């Protein structure tokens, strides 16, 4: 008689988050990588990884922005691939500082580059997180025309993250208008994706927001400024703006 394997996947017992860091954050607002900024971010992540499973998507805007390069006459696909390579450089920088902080880290790239990163395999990423490792996803989606916001939403869904954490520079959440231009702008503590889309509030790009909305994935938009904000966001403390399906 044939034996049927009825083993089921164990349910995750810890909170699992997907942290989205822009290239501008990694660069400290300048071109390239700002070591002190990345070191500070790594220490904040390290303070939370014993309690929470963490995956990270990193942008590449501190090196290249495909959309901007294409406006200057470069082929959009080629420009986007340059941006993807920029994200991998940021991943390696963050990996280095995380490991200096005592956190075992893996980089997974959507573009094969076996000497510096693993291939992107969702099941393997989940296993790494279950073992207490941080996983950093690089090279975007491995395809042109996809923003790293969209990649953050997609990766979060594929590794079964509980929430997407959007780290922002210069703003501490979502406002009714640009607070730098409109002094009457009010900060929103809670916002639905429907409201954000209807009012054209640019939390992240529309493709990413729609993906989160359709799959009931919540998001927290918070400011990088403030002592320990990255740690607090990872641990699930209330800060910034909660965007809900």
Swiss-Prot record:
GO aspect biological process, one term: 'de novo' CTP biosynthetic process
Record field: catalytic activity: UMP + ATP = UDP + ADP
EC number: 2.7.4.22
Cited SUPFAM superfamilies: Carbamate kinase-like
Gene Ontology CC terms: cytoplasm
Record-stated family: Belongs to the UMP kinase family.
Protein name in the entry: Uridylate kinase
Species of provenance: Paenarthrobacter aurescens (strain TC1)
């Amino acid at each position: 008689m044939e034996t049927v394997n009825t083993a089921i996947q164990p349910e995750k017992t810890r909170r699992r988050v997907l942290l989205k860091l822009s290239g501008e954050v990694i660069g400290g607002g300048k071109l390239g990588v700002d070591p002190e900024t990345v070191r500070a971010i790594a220490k904040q992540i390290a303070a939370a990884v014993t309690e929470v499973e963490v995956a990270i998507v990193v942008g590449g805007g501190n090196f290249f922005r495909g959309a901007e390069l294409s406006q200057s006459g470069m082929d959009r696909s080629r420009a986007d691939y340059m941006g993807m390579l920029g994200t991998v450089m940021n991943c390696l920088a963050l990996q280095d500082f995380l490991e200096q902080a005592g956190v075992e880290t893996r980089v997974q790239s959507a573009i094969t580059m076996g000497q510096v990163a693993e291939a992107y395999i969702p099941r393997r990423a989940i296993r790494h997180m279950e073992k207490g490792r941080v996983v950093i996803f690089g090279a975007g989606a491995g395809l042109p025309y996809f923003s790293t916001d969209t990649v953050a939403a997609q990766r979060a869904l594929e590794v079964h993250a509980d929430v997407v954490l959007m780290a922002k520079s210069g703003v501490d959440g979502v406002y009714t208008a640009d607070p730098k231009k409109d002094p009457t702008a009010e900060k929103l503590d809670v916002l639905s994706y429907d409201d954000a889309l209807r009012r054209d509030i640019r939390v992240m790009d529309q493709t990413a927001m729609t993906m989160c909305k359709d799959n009931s994935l919540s998001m927290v938009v918070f400011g990088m400024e403030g002592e320990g904000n990255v740690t607090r966001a990872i641990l699930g403390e209330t800060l910034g703006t909660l965007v809900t399906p």
